[in-house]
Each structure stands twice: as C-alpha cells, then as structure tokens.
C-alpha cells in the first residue's frame, strides 16, 4: 500500500545523500553521440548539445559514457576523463548546465573487452581470456591483479576530475564480461 502521493514529473527532487535539488524529475539518459575530440576532450558541439537539454527543461542531464583509461575507449568520439587536460571543457559544460537550472551527471566507463584494439592499440582486456574476433590475437587478454588495480585507480582519478569540474553525481559502468 502506498502511504503518500506519488510525485509528478514536474516536482523537484532532493537527493538524500548530497542535498542537491533537481528542479524536476525529467532525466536525460546517457546517450552516445560520438562528438568528442580524438584526445577524449569534450567538444564545443557536444557541450552545446547537452546544454540545450538543460535549456529545454531537463532537471538532470547525463553525459555519454566517459572513458577513464586510454585503453578503455569503446568507440570513436567518446568522451575521456583520463587526463587533467580534459577537465576544463567539462568545467565549461557543468557551468552552462547549472546556469540553465539543471544538474549534470557523468557516466564513467571502461570499455574492457569492448574497447577495440583498432582504437586503443592494445588487446582488449576481459575477466578471462576468451575468443574475440576484434583482437589481433583472436582473444581478449585476461585481466591481471595489476590491471584490475590500475582500472580501479583510473576510475578514482576520473571521479576526482569530475569533482574538479563541478559535476554533482557519477554513474559507473564497465565491460569486463566473461
């Protein structure tokens, strides 16, 4: 049994842990649009695209997946947060979205076995060595303990970059698969 009224989409929402308030419950999901620069920095075109969502009334805007490691890039035009030089354009995006009344979240990502060797120059990494047609060896590379610790550290450093850019919340995902 519901003990209180269900909120309406136009109602604001307060995040219990952080106290941040979204002006409404309309959330732009993370969508890949392949507009970022080759070095992973978010482009002015992508900044404009995301900011238009805030201008249009979304309470929360979520970035496309942002890779945390150079070897974790899953596709061309993907946002990166694996280097400090990528913070400034993120800061610009955050400022614009906030000025238009929205909150912005980043989706941090490592492509794992879905990070093509053609983009990264490295054999895709996975939880175990398995057949994989997009690898020059025909297999993924099994993640070592060192790899796992490095990727954890990469997520941590990317999260710190998000904080430096002023992002409010983070979402995490990876593709280590089998």
Regions flagged by a language model, labelled:
Residues 1-109, 151:
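N-terminal capping/small domains of soluble enzymes
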Residues 33, 66-69, 131-133, 176-178:
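Short connector loops/turns at beta-strand edges and beta->alpha or beta->beta junctions
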Residues 52-53, 78, 83-86, 115-125, ...:
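Short alpha-helical interface elements
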Residues 61-64, 104-108, 165-178:
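Short beta-strand segments at enzyme active-site cores
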Residues 69-73, 115-117, 178:
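Short acidic/His/Gly/Ser-rich catalytic and metal-binding motifs that mark active-site loops
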Residues 95, 103, 109-167:
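Non-globular sequence segments
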